[in-house]
Amino acid sequence: MKKYENFCNAFNNLKDIYDYEEPFGNVELTGLVGLFEACFEQSWKAMKELLEQSGYDSAQTGSPRHIIKTAYQATMIDDEELWLAALVSRNNVAHAYNKDVALDIIYDTKEKY
């Protein structure tokens, strides 16, 4: 399963986020937010692939939100609300040029996700 391998690699890279503490420079902020984004993207795509392989036809055209909800129903994940919060953070990556948004994403990644 290529998507699962990609997720594992992204997750291992994301662990580096704990090596950094504030104050962050711009490059560090951008890089840490990028690690979160890459890991989240690979996680929902791996879930999608697993759901498809398990016979969930609706997963074939599902959005990340739909995949998360289906994964929860399939007991693939335990905390639907936390995953949906992570999706909101991923959607906020587009606004990570705002330092406060970037810091929120980094904090949530370290403390919640």
Predicted regions, residues:
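Solvent-exposed interaction patches of small proteins and small membrane subunits
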Residues: 1-113
